[in-house]
């Protein structure tokens, strides 16, 4: 089945989106919502006409250096990692958390627990769940009680995804503290949430996007500034 949609921007600009086949990969895509339609359509991000790559902000080496610095900062801030655990926000946050875990193991000689939470606006059947992101799955095979939980995500934007992830952690127990580590902070917060560890701060406009790419999901490593 093929879907046809139009991505309606706040400015009222209509941008046609190419159809997405059933067999198309969802690994590098974009949810497009039709106001009043009650449905969301998943469309390949590179099929959206008018979205262009404006600049490459970080290459593979820069991403690696940023993650290593974040790993050192997490260990230093917490005076070691004996009581630290990592929780990645799927999908790229989970992958970044695993990389930070491996870095910390090389630095401190300890392998910290690492889990994930799945935060989304939509069910797999494309029906909108909520105006705010909700947690559909939490995979924590360890206790968070009296631990310092470090949430990991690729891009920090409004703060709503981070808030949903924090709520999921709190439902699993009472941690000593919750910290937030992100590869890129692009600003435009809608909630009073601030990252404790930031790989790179990138001020953006509302017509710009930050796209973090990882080989596990995108076939390459890098951070790109996209423009609508």
Residue ranges and their predicted role:
Residues 2-9, 13-16, 25-228:
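PRPP-associated nucleotide enzymes
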């Amino acid at each position: 089945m093929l879907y046809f949609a139009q991505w309606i921007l706040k400015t009222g600009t209509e941008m046609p989106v190419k159809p997405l086949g059933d067999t198309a990969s969802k690994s590098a895509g974009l949810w497009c919502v039709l106001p009043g339609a009650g449905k969301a359509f998943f469309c390949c991000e590179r099929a959206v006409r008018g979205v262009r790559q404006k600049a490459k902000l970080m290459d593979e080496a820069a991403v690696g250096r940023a993650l290593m610095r974040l790993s050192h900062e997490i260990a230093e801030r917490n005076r070691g990692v004996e009581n630290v655990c990592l929780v990645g926000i799927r999908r790229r946050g989970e992958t970044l958390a695993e990389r930070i875990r491996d870095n910390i193991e090389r630095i401190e000689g300890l392998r910290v627990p690492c889990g994930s939470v799945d935060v989304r606006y939509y069910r797999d059947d494309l029906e909108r769940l909520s105006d705010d992101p909700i947690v559909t799955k939490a995979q924590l095979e360890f206790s968070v009680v009296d631990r310092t939980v470090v949430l990991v995500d690729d891009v920090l934007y409004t703060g709503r995804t981070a808030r949903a992830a924090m709520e999921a952690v709190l439902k699993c127990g009472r941690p000593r503290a919750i910290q937030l580590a992100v590869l890129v902070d692009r600003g435009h917060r809608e909630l009073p949430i601030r990252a404790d560890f930031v790989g790179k701060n990138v001020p953006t406009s509302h017509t710009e996007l930050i796209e973090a790419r990882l080989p596990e999901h995108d076939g390459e490593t890098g951070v790109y500034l996209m423009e609508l």
